[in-house]
């Protein structure tokens, strides 16, 4: 995610994104996001400058731009760009650590023609790991949503439910099956995986008959494996 103020372009956040393995229930939707990215140094060295050149070339002066990449042994390759706010609510994480809120800046720009803040404090190297767990549902009508066991818990930063009791979910393999997102932070990858387990224990979404509606959530073992940690 890049924030742009009066022609100054700043890298605000770099995430690693894990795709859902529920291939029969959804398309390739995002299951889990974590920042800082393990590819941060490689990205800054190889890609960041080129992205800034691109944004300057299109005349970007004020706003927010987001890019998606695939990183593997062949390097880092871009496949999608948006000159807009992305869907992961990254402004909440950036605001927490850097006191910069690009959502408010965009509102300010739409009303006054000025972003209303500077990028002096912008820094994508956050002091903690910050993660987002995405929640998807089977088809049906929601009869119960309970996450009370997570409210106020250490590490839980934000619970954003996009669905409520009575909503009908159509099983069509799109973001229409998304129930919401839970953001959390910790000092280590091991702590992040522990919070994922706790979320699974303390979150309930059922249909009118009391059946579980949650699709299988992100497997924390994938994160440990990617980070080379024995779990």
Roles of regions detected by a PLM:
Residues 1-2, 143:
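PAS-family sensory/regulatory modules and their coupling/dimerization elements
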Residues 75-77:
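Conserved protein kinase catalytic/activation segment
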